[in-house]
Amino acid sequence: MGIIDFLLALMQDMILSAIPAVGFAMVFNVPHRALPWCALLGALGHGSRMLMMSAGFNIEWSTFMASLLVGSIGIQWSRWYLAHPKVFTVAAVIPMFPGISAYTAMISAVKISHLGYSEPMMITLLTNFLKASSIVGALSIGLSVPGLWLYRKRPRV
């Protein structure tokens, strides 16, 4: 894959991830003036995750680093635009939620309950459940840590 193809894929990924970020921002009743910034932050988060995954990181660590980036930028933008950081960050990380892994784990659990236990189905269930749980944990910790770092009142040492 050439560099042009990679950049086009990255741009496509960023544009397509900005759409659900704006959609969820509208569901969460974000002010209209903040909607473009939610879209930009969602695109930056998903694009940075794609960059890290293409550099060789796994999806869990890439998601953690991308959510750290989203949280840090969201805190800075909240200072500039006098809004709460969650206005920008929560809708921006929604496109990074692990829908396919969670869905596959859920379908595997339903199949096990209907058809009975089988080892391959249990492996599929556990693999996808742990992957989805790790990604959701990475998103929540990655969004929390910048606030803990940047709003700290006491000295670090």
Curated annotation (Swiss-Prot):
GO annotation, biological process: succinate transport
GO CC, any one term: plasma membrane
Statement: the UniProt record of this protein carries the keyword Transmembrane: yes
UniProt key word Cell membrane: yes
One Pfam family it belongs to: ThrE_2
UniProt topology in membrane: Multi-pass membrane protein
Primary location group: membrane
Spans traversing the lipid bilayer: 8-28, 55-75, 87-107, 129-149
Domain of life: Bacteria
Localization (cell): Cell inner membrane
Keywords: Cell inner membrane, Cell membrane, Membrane, Transmembrane, Transmembrane helix, Transport
Family: Belongs to the ThrE exporter (TC 2.A.79) family.
HAMAP family: YjjB
Subunit structure, as described in the record: The transporter is composed of YjjB and YjjP.
Function: Involved in succinate export with YjjP. Both proteins are required for export.
Protein name, UniProt field: Probable succinate transporter subunit YjjB
Gene: yjjB
